[in-house]
């Protein structure tokens, strides 16, 4: 990764074999700690073929995928079916609101969420609580409706809003204009989930 002016390079490039080799070298320690490997991002499914190749070369390591689910169906299935657990981030129930805040609609995300229910891979749905955006009654009611309509019971975890972006923008000398009050405290109402018999908790 380079800086905005190309003046600084951060990170390293690996082949799938090189990355798997590094992870396998720590396998014993990870197993002793009852840990494993979590592929997160950004969005790890942007490199789905590489990710699938890497997972195939891991030796007896628990693999978790942290994804927003916005990927082609075949890419999502190829990776999720290789994992032991999936953290599925679901931000907004309404298609237009999703497009407004993320730049894309949620059609592929909802399709892959339903697909995940059929793969047999254990997973949890996580909703980041962005004040005034994702913590609204309308959005939480919509998400509860989506989850209650899935072909299997899935727990939901409401995550606290991460305010780290403000500092990162400042470090990059960029103006932070989130379009919402990022200093406000979210106020999620769990009753939207309990009313539909959906298990939900505050992280």
Name each model-derived stretch.
Residues 52, 103-108, 138-143:
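Charged helix-capping and loop-helix junction motifs
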Residues 97, 113-143:
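Conserved strand-turn element in the central/C-terminal portion of the radical SAM core barrel
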Residues 37-39, 63-65, 86-88, 123-125, ...:
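Hydrophobic faces of well-ordered beta-strands that scaffold small-molecule active sites
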Residues 131-203:
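Auxiliary Fe-S-binding modules of radical SAM enzymes
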Residues 51-60, 117, 148, 194:
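Surface-exposed amphipathic alpha-helices with a cationic face
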Residues 44-46, 69-76, 86-102, 129-130, ...:
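Conserved radical SAM core fold
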Residues 1-82:
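Conserved Radical SAM active-site core
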């Amino acid at each position: 990764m380079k800086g905005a002016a190309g003046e600084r390079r951060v990170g390293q490039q690996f082949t799938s074999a090189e990355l798997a080799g590094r992870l396998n070298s720590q396998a014993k320690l990870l197993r002793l700690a009852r840990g494993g490997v979590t592929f997160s991002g950004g969005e790890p499914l942007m490199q789905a073929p590489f990710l699938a190749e890497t997972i195939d070369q891991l030796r007896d390591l628990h693999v978790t995928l942290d994804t927003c689910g916005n990927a082609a169906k075949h890419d999502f299935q190829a990776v999720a079916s290789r994992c032991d657990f999936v953290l599925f981030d679901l931000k907004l129930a309404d298609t237009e609101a999703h497009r407004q805040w993320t730049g894309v609609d949620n059609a592929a995300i909802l399709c892959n969420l339903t697909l995940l229910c059929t793969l047999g891979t254990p997973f949890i749905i996580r909703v980041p609580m962005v004040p005034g955006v994702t913590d609204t009654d309308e959005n939480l009611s919509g998400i509860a409706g989506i989850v209650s309509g899935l072909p299997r019971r899935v727990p939901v975890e409401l995550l606290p809003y991460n305010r780290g972006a403000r500092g990162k923008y400042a470090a990059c000398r960029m103006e932070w204009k989130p379009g919402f009050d990022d200093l406000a405290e979210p106020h999620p109402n769990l009753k939207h989930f309990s009313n539909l018999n959906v298990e939900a908790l505050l992280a």
